[in-house]
Structure formats: structure tokens, C-alpha cells
Amino acid sequence: MKIFIFYNPLKLSNDDLEENILKPFNESNIEVIGYAAAGSTVEEKQAQVADFFVIFGGDGTVLKIAEIAAIFSKPVIAVNTGNLGFLSSYSSSEIKELIEDIQKENISFSFRHLLECHVGTKKVVVLNDIVLLKSQPLGTMNVDVKIEEHTLFSFAGDGLIVSTPTGSTAYALSAGGPIIHPELNVVQLIPLAAHALNIRPFIAPPTQRIEIILKNMSKGFVYVTGDGDIIHRMEPGMSIFVTSSEMTIKLAQRNGNNYLNALDKKLGFGRRFE
């Protein structure tokens, strides 16, 4: 069994990496063929021969690895060394259990759908969301959203979230969107602070292309972000296109700990408040 390790250097020191992660794996029959900080360049040969990508960090670290995992079709096992760790199946204190589960093949995987954002000649692939945000705190942006040439939204507001089901428990949830089971293949659109009573979140099919047109701004310009990273600056009259990607990633879920368990344990979803 061969693994490649990605880690967040802000959450994991070199000493911790050597002593608490690399050493236990090296003492098992699991070969660590390489390791790298999330976001750094990885040799294609190493990525291809790995059986799994094992990620040490928070949810943001998982998001940084999503595209490369999809490109090389490598299952992802996430170990939380951050805060919430909603996408993680193991905590940093469960390295022994992780090694045993890998050895015994006691891990199942769920397929997570991705989004593609096309900006000019650039294509960006994300696991959570594409977001349009104002550069200035005051004022509004005027946006048209089209699905296959049909105008779905035309509104003034603070921005727009285009989310995957996996991203429905991230920014989209805070903005009033529904929780969508991650194994569904749909695209969610959530206007941010739309100045209209008739503008509400909308769930679109994955087969249709979404065009987002920035008509005008009262102040500043618009940032386009992909999983939290700025990928483009929009000026009035510009468009971007978002589609569901044909690529997916396989994200580990510990046997007995499915998505509904994670909602309960990490978000407190469905609990009655006494």
C-alpha cells in the first residue's frame, strides 16, 4: 500500500510531521512515497503510483487538494488538524486507527462532484463553491444569471454563491441555503442579500451551463473566488460560466461514520434544543 501525504504547514510543524505521522506509517507496511505542503508542486510520477492521498489539515487543506486528486483519480483520506474538519474522517489523535483501517481496508468512499468555472481561457475546478463578492463593503452589484440562455435571476445585491452539494454546508449554509446530500449531482445558486422579495436560492441540474453577467457596480469591482481563493476580477459587462465538472473525487468516510453522522456530530443538525 502506497500513500502520498499533503499537509498544512501552518497546522503541522516539521517535528510533528516526522515524529507523529511519518514515523508511525514507516513502522507499518504502508509506504509513504512522498509528502508536500498543500498547494505545492507534486511530481506526476509520485501522484500516479500512490494508492491514496492522505491529507493532514482542515477543510481548507482538502479544498486545495481536490483538483489534483480528481485529475489523478486518487481517493482522499482527510485527517483533521484544524477546527471543524467537516470533510475529515479522522482526528490527528487517531493515526493508529487510520493505519489499521487502511491495512484492513476498513474505509469506504463517497463520490463528490466538482464545479468548473470558465473565465476567458482560464478553467478552475473547485469542490465547494464559486463566489462573486464586492470589493467594497458599501453599494451593490447588478447581476444577471442565465441557465442555457434563459434569464433565471436579475438582481441587485451583495453577490452570488454557486455551490456544489459538498459546499452546501460551507458559505452557502451561512447564506441561507439548504443542506444538500453530497452524493447528489446538482448545482446550487444563492444570491447574497438580494434587494428583492422574489429572489430565492435555486437548485439547477448539472447538465446545464450557467452564465453570470456583471451588469454594473455602484462602487468598486467584483472578485470571483474559487474555494476561497481569488481567481478573477470582474468589471461591468464581463461574464463567467459555471458548469458541473465531469470529474469527481472519492472522499473517505470511516465505516460507521456516514454523512448524516457528520451532520449530527459536527454541526449539531437535527438536534432538539432543551
UniProtKB/Swiss-Prot annotation:
Q: What Enzyme Commission number does this protein have?
A: 2.7.1.23
Q: Transmembrane region positions?
A: none
Checking Pfam families in the record gives: NAD_kinase, NAD_kinase_C
Which residues of the sequence carry a binding annotation for NAD(+)?
59-60, 64, 128-129, 158, 169-174, 193
Q: Can you say what this protein is called?
A: NAD kinase
Indicate the residues that form the catalytic site. 59 (proton acceptor)
What gene name is listed for this protein?
nadK
Gene Ontology MF, one: ATP binding
The answer to whether the entry has keyword NAD is yes
- Say yes or no: keyword Nucleus present: no
Bridged cysteine pairs (disulfide): none
Which catalysed reactions does the entry list for this protein?
NAD(+) + ATP = ADP + NADP(+) + H(+)
Main EC class the enzyme belongs to:
transferase
GO cellular component terms, semicolon-separated: cytoplasm
GO BP of this protein: NAD metabolic process; NADP biosynthetic process
What cofactor requirement does the entry state?
A: a divalent metal cation
Indicate the family of this protein.
Belongs to the NAD kinase family.
Its function, per the record, reads: Involved in the regulation of the intracellular balance of NAD and NADP, and is a key enzyme in the biosynthesis of NADP. Catalyzes specifically the phosphorylation on 2'-hydroxyl of the adenosine moiety of NAD to yield NADP.
Protein location: Cytoplasm
